[in-house]
């Protein structure tokens, strides 16, 4: 469906809530429901130039009014047949009328302060006077403080100040004789620290490393003694003995290397099992604590159905505790068998 340029624009409604004292509210309600033609003569609203104060007249009785801001926006709906509703406007303000209010409040003359920050603070305090902390129903009393989060403050820096700071930094860099920069990678430092740490236990690894070094020293001493004593023998015997000694030395070195590799593999396996044991102990302790809390809860509950439900949960925790104990005992047995080897 095409629109022509001659179509008149849609009229937008501007609405607010009118709150009156109970006796005047009932009068206005009856007049609206009866559909009197002279409603405009019975109810008039006059706003002052400041846009926040005004006078509401009900049957020519003046009431002081103040326009306040509601905590949130509400929708206004209209119906003709009480079956289909149409949205007409968004409402965010309410005109509160009182009998004992000041009909003509004093007008504050604007004074230009020297400090702009002081003027902003003054305007903010002035706006707070017209903020309504409650909703339109009784359960929503003080809803602005109970349900709404405070607005986050955004600190803006004016662009001229930023440009001035950038120019100052660039000028100081240009005046510098020399510059020095350094890049530190946290991941690399952590890797180097981890590589520097000894993974195996200090007692076992120190004992095995000392044992291996003693074997290497003994082999070197044997080789040196035999090589020095063989100088007095004949050349043929010297060559044969040297070859035999080299073979023996190589065999022993290979055996020591294999043993060292086996020891390292055993150490890693032991550490892995020990870690699993520690984790299993933590899980077992957590399960036991949960079971203890469940037992205390069952003792306090009097409802039979609820107690049966809690008892079922406790039985599951007990079964889980038994399974974790079995896993822990099997891990400990495996660790003991490795240490005996």
Swiss-Prot record:
Composition skew (Low complexity), residue ranges: 105-116, 328-341
Modified residues (Phosphoserine): 171, 200-201, 213, 256
Family matches, as InterPro entries: TAF7 (IPR037817), TAFII55_prot_cons_reg (IPR006751)
GO CC annotations on file: MLL1 complex; transcription factor TFIID complex
Keywords: Coiled coil, Nucleus, Phosphoprotein, Transcription, Transcription regulation, Ubl conjugation
Keyword Chaperone listed: no
GO BP, one annotated term: RNA polymerase II preinitiation complex assembly
Keyword RNA-binding: no
Region named Disordered: 105-126, 188-212, 321-341
PTM remark: Phosphorylated by CIITA. Phosphorylation at Ser-256 by TAF1 in early G1 phase disrupts binding to TAF1. Ubiquitinated by TRIM26; leading to proteasomal degradation.
Coiled coil (UniProt feature): 236-341
Cell location: Nucleus
GO molecular function annotations of the record: RNA polymerase II general transcription initiation factor activity
Functional description taken from the UniProt entry: The TFIID basal transcription factor complex plays a major role in the initiation of RNA polymerase II (Pol II)-dependent transcription. TFIID recognizes and binds promoters with or without a TATA box via its subunit TBP, a TATA-box-binding protein, and promotes assembly of the pre-initiation complex (PIC). The TFIID complex consists of TBP and TBP-associated factors (TAFs), including TAF1, TAF2, TAF3, TAF4, TAF5, TAF6, TAF7, TAF8, TAF9, TAF10, TAF11, TAF12 and TAF13. TAF7 forms a promoter DNA binding subcomplex of TFIID, together with TAF1 and TAF2.
Protein name per the record: Transcription initiation factor TFIID subunit 7
Lineage: Eukaryota, Metazoa, Chordata, Craniata, Vertebrata
């Amino acid at each position: 469906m095409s629109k022509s340029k001659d179509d008149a624009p849609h009229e937008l409604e501007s609405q607010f809530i009118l709150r009156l004292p109970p006796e005047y509210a009932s009068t206005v309600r009856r007049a609206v429901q009866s559909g009197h033609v002279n409603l405009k003569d019975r109810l008039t609203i006059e706003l002052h130039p400041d846009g926040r104060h005004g006078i509401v007249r009900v049957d020519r009785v003046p009431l002081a009014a103040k326009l306040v801001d509601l905590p949130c926006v509400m929708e206004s709906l209209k119906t003709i047949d009480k079956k289909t509703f149409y949205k007409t406007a968004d409402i965010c303000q309410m005109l509160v009328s009182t009998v004992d209010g000041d009909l003509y409040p004093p007008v504050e003359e604007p004074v230009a302060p020297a400090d702009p920050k002081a003027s902003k603070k003054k305007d903010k305090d002035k706006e707070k006077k017209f903020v309504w902390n409650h909703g339109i129903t009784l359960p929503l009393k003080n809803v602005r403080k109970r349900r709404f989060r405070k607005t986050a403050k955004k600190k803006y820096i004016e662009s001229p100040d930023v440009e001035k700071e950038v120019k100052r930094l660039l000028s100081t860099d240009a005046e510098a004789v020399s510059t020095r920069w350094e890049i530190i990678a946290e991941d690399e430092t952590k890797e180097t620290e981890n590589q520097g740490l000894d993974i195996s236990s200090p007692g076992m690894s120190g004992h095995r490393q000392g044992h291996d070094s003693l074997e290497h020293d003994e082999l070197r001493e044997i080789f040196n003694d035999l090589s020095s004593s063989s100088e007095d023998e004949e050349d043929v015997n010297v060559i044969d003995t040297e070859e035999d000694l080299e073979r023996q030395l190589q065999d022993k070195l290979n055996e020591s290397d294999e043993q060292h590799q086996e020891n390292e593999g055993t150490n890693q396996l032991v550490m892995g099992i020990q870690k699993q044991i520690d984790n299993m102990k933590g899980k077992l302790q957590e399960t036991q604590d949960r079971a203890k809390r469940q037992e205390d809860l069952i003792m306090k509950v009097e409802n039979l159905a609820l107690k049966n439900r809690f008892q079922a949960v406790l039985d599951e925790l007990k079964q889980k505790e038994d399974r974790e104990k079995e896993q822990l005992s099997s891990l400990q047995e495996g660790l003991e068998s490795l240490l005996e080897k």
